[in-house]
């Protein structure tokens, strides 16, 4: 029987070429991209190339591209940033009860700690 995987919004199989590159980076080019030694310089090249690629695809500037550790951190950054940036326009935020916990918890934070009204 052929497997049909329907949870791709949570985890999707990587292309083989992506998996091979990730393995190479993690096993060979694993330097700290913030360091000035050779491994760090090589690691920084991967980040720079990725930023250039994403910026070109999304038609934005490289300085507008941020990499995070995952979806929850991205949700937090986007929601908190947008809420704070637009607070002068009003402090009412609207969400739904079926949102991912990362969204619900961030909305709760904005309500309890930053004074937003959430419905």
Regions found by a protein language model. Give the residues of each.
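Pyridoxal 5′-phosphate
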Residues: 1-119
């Amino acid at each position: 029987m052929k497997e049909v995987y329907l949870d791709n919004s949570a985890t999707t199989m990587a292309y083989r070429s992506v998996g091979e590159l990730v393995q190479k980076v993690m096993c060979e080019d694993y330097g700290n991209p913030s360091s000035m030694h050779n491994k760090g310089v090589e690691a920084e090249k991967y980040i720079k190339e990725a930023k250039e690629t994403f910026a070109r695809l999304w038609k934005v500037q490289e300085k507008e591209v941020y990499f995070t550790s995952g979806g929850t951190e991205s949700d937090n950054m986007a929601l908190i940033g947008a809420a704070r940036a637009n607070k002068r326009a009003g402090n009412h935020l609207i969400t739904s009860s079926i949102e991912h916990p990362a969204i619900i918890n961030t909305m709760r934070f904005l309500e309890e700690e930053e004074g937003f009204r959430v419905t």
